[in-house]
Amino acid sequence: MPLTPSHKGAVCSDCQGRLEDAVTAACGHTFCRLCLPLPPQMGAQPSSRVLLCPVCQEKEQTEPVLVPVPLGPLGETYCEEHGEKIYFFCENDAEFLCVFCREGPSHQAHAVGFLDEAIQPYRDRLRGRLEALITERDEIEDMKSREDQKLQVLLAQIESKKRHVEATFERLQQELGEQQRLLLARLTELERQIWKERDKYISKLSEEVARLGTQVKELEEKCQQPASELLQDVRVNQSRCETKTFVSPEAISPDLVKKIRDLHRKILTLPEMLRAFSENLVHHLETDSGIVTLDPLTASPSLVLSEDRKSVRYTRQKQNLPDSPLRFEGLPVVLGSPGFSSGRHRWQVEVQLGEGGGCTVGVVGEEVRRKGEQGLSAEEGVWAVILSHQQCWASTSPGTDLPLSEIPRRVGVALDYEAGRVALLNAETRAPIFTFAASFSGKVFPFFAVWKKGSCLTLKG
């Protein structure tokens, strides 16, 4: 049963005034009943008559010609069938009903109630939905506010780090500049001392040359004297002819020479020191110290992993694990995750060895043999060091003994994929253990092996 609500400000297509008792012709124009050329009867033109639309003058046989448009008072709704005000609502058909509709046979068995009563559950549902939407909106706004605060904190941290970097490099530049000035000042002072000692040396030589010149002149004159005169002063003349040993002065004192040599050695090492500093700085800034965890899909049945996948220990009783092409069988091995196919990476492992136990730490190629007979060598894609109480060696081919005074309590691994370099070191003392030169063709993974009861490896950092 169609309904048409009230139309605020509706205008008649004919008189252009406010619609009164509106009807709509088949052509689509809506106008007041009083504007019809023929008087309406019961809200419709008789079917035997021809309607002439007062607007478009279109003649059309209609049956019925007019459709009442029940606008009613502003804000009210009327039944199109009976023209009565709507008071009821049918829950079953979701229709608005007037008094006549309510008493009709179509809704006798239906749940029909007053509009105010029928609308309340819908209002309640709408209010519930509205409250839920408001709550959701508030939660989103709160979340946005929290994330904005986090963002502001991160931005503030970045700004602080920028200032820290600027200040650090400024201090470094100042320190380098100061060392440059000190070094140049020392060189200038040595240069001054060299000139001073040179002048002193030249002065002594000049004095000796002058003295010798005087003696030469005197002796030349004596040689020209008659024999009687020369023999009169024979003893004096003999003493003058005696050669005096000339002690040559030092052009530069030994102390000054030592200072020059010491400074020379220090200057010679400057380029290497600066190169090493630059490389270490680049390595530090470009090396990824991301989190490495143990991959349970690769773990040998002889190994037990911690829940956080940071620690592995050896067990005599093999576990019943699902078979996997990734799992190592035979050697008590587990790989780390993720694997690497580029870049620089580093991680550290804490070592704890049981009696007679040992461990292996390094990297391994993706295509390494995991089933059957397995070997530990660089030729088979394993670049690692084997540490035990009896012997320590690197997995070169043949193996390289490592003269370690003690087993490192923490081993650091530094991987440079592009350079083909795997360096292992004592993470506590920074002393190198061994460095491999390799050529990687695929992904490489952190490699760990541990054996004997009481032996354990734990990833740190």
Curated annotation (Swiss-Prot):
Zn(2+) binds at C79, H82, C101, H107. One of its GO terms (cellular component) is focal adhesion. Residues 123-230 form a coiled coil. Its EC number is 2.3.2.27. Keywords: Cell junction, Coiled coil, Cytoplasm, Metal-binding, Nucleus, Transferase, Ubl conjugation pathway, Zinc, Zinc-finger. It is found in: Cytoplasm; Nucleus; Cell junction, Focal adhesion. One of its GO terms (molecular function) is transcription coactivator activity. A zinc finger (B box-type) spans 74-115. It catalyses: S-ubiquitinyl-[E2 ubiquitin-conjugating enzyme]-L-cysteine + [acceptor protein]-L-lysine = [E2 ubiquitin-conjugating enzyme]-L-cysteine + N(6)-ubiquitinyl-[acceptor protein]-L-lysine. A zinc finger (RING-type) spans 12-57. Residues 272-461 form the B30.2/SPRY domain. Transmembrane segments: none annotated. Its main location: cytoplasm. GO terms for biological process: innate immune response; negative regulation of intracellular transport of viral material; negative regulation of non-canonical NF-kappaB signal transduction; positive regulation of RIG-I signaling pathway; positive regulation of type I interferon production; suppression of viral release by host. Interacts with paxillin/PXN; this interaction recruits TRIM15 to focal adhesions. Interacts with TRIM8; this interaction prevents TRIM8 cytoplasmic translocation. E3 ubiquitin ligase that plays a role in several processes including innate antiviral immnity, cell migration and chemotaxis. Acts as a 'Lys-63'-specific ubiquitin ligase for MAPK1/ERK2 and MAPK3/ERK1, promoting their activation by facilitating their interaction with MAP2K1 and MAP2K2. Also plays a role in cell migration and chemotaxis by acting as a stable focal adhesion component upon recruitment by multi-adapter protein paxillin/PXN. Functions in the RIGI-mediated interferon induction pathway upstream or at the level of MAVS. Belongs to the TRIM/RBCC family. This is E3 ubiquitin-protein ligase TRIM15. It comes from Sus scrofa (Pig).
